[in-house]
Amino acid sequence: MDAKIPPLTPFKKPSGTSLLILLILLLGLLCLGFAQILDLSSISLSLLFPLAVSAICSAILGYVVVPVLRRLKAGQVIQEDGPQTHLKKAGTPTMGGIFFVPVAVIIALIWSKLDPAVLAVSIVTLAYMGIGWIDDWQILRQKSNKGLTPRMKLILQIAIAVGFCIWTFLTQSADLTNIALPGQIILPLGLFFWIIAGFVLVAESNATNLTDGVDGLAGGTGSLAFLGLAALMASNNPGLMIFCACMSGGCLGFIVHNRNPATVFMGDTGSLALGGSLGAIGILSGHVWGLFLVSGIFFVESLSVIAQVSYYKATKGPDGKGKRLLKMAPLHHHLELSGWAETQIVGLFYLINAGLAVLAVISS
């Protein structure tokens, strides 16, 4: 009998609580590190206070909302063709985005004294949350994994993106269309910028949605991404800095309930809101390059799906079947089927995203 070779994984399997502690430490270290990188001694407290308040409020509210979702039987429907280990998660409450996203938005609006930029981004965030809620509700009603049709969801996402781009075009400086790249390179895009802006909003919301497939993954990486953007806002946009810090804290508070084994999932209600929010902030602040870096995990997850589908279609034979690059897309499912534990994947992605946040601040 052949000996079984254990799967190659980067480190021992951590617990969900260990990952929560890791996330808290990473966020704290990033706050301190950003103060040194940007030479702004006050930035640490400016980031930590709204982050902590939002995290605590979201975590506390979760203890009220999660039992309500459970009583309403708002349980997640698990895809049968997904990883078999996920079948045991069937029935776990979903739509968790309804408690941590509004909390973060409300705290940000109050803290920033209804800053116009924060108000605009808040509207986009809640609008994308609304799309996600409709999708989640349809799934729960039909007791299947099919909510809004992909076409209808895309139409709604594009409509919000167009509305936001029109508002930004009418209210912001024309200099916004010049994208700053590393090495003091300025890329003047003119009207083409708005096509990219619309694409970024839609793509970012879908990318975070794809990443939300493992306990603690989308919320934790989202928290780190928002904190990276917050640091980029520190010198010239305190309102958006506060908003990003609050969203980072909201995600952290959600992880209290979503860490492995999760007692609630954010659903499309949360994941679409996170992506739409990140995209809107990156566009409105002019930090498109920084957005690309802090969203590196989301980008790779999306790219893995695109590559999987494209390769399958390109290699399709007479029998209608093609070949697959990955065992399953997105990438986190491929790693699961390769023998990685969920918590190993999440821990590694947290560390990578923290590094990307630092890189974004250094290179912007």
Swiss-Prot record:
EC number, UniProt record: 2.7.8.13
Keywords from the UniProt entry: Cell cycle, Cell division, Cell inner membrane, Cell membrane, Cell shape, Cell wall biogenesis/degradation, Magnesium, Membrane, Metal-binding, Peptidoglycan synthesis, Transferase, Transmembrane, Transmembrane helix
Keyword Nucleotidyltransferase: no
A GO molecular function held by the record: UDP-N-acetylmuramoyl-L-alanyl-D-glutamyl-meso-2,6-diaminopimelyl-D-alanyl-D-alanine:undecaprenyl-phosphate transferase activity
Cofactor(s) this protein cannot do without: Mg(2+)
Reaction equation(s) it catalyzes: UDP-N-acetyl-alpha-D-muramoyl-L-alanyl-gamma-D-glutamyl-meso-2,6-diaminopimeloyl-D-alanyl-D-alanine + di-trans,octa-cis-undecaprenyl phosphate = di-trans,octa-cis-undecaprenyl diphospho-N-acetyl-alpha-D-muramoyl-L-alanyl-D-glutamyl-meso-2,6-diaminopimeloyl-D-alanyl-D-alanine + UMP
Coiled coil spans: none
Cell location: Cell inner membrane
Superkingdom: Bacteria
Bilayer topology term: Multi-pass membrane protein
Pfam families given in the database record: Glycos_transf_4, MraY_sig1
UniProt GO cellular component terms: plasma membrane
Functional pathway: Cell wall biogenesis; peptidoglycan biosynthesis
Family the UniProt entry places it in: Belongs to the glycosyltransferase 4 family. MraY subfamily.
Protein name in the entry: Phospho-N-acetylmuramoyl-pentapeptide-transferase
Organism: Rippkaea orientalis (strain PCC 8801 / RF-1) (Cyanothece sp. (strain PCC 8801))
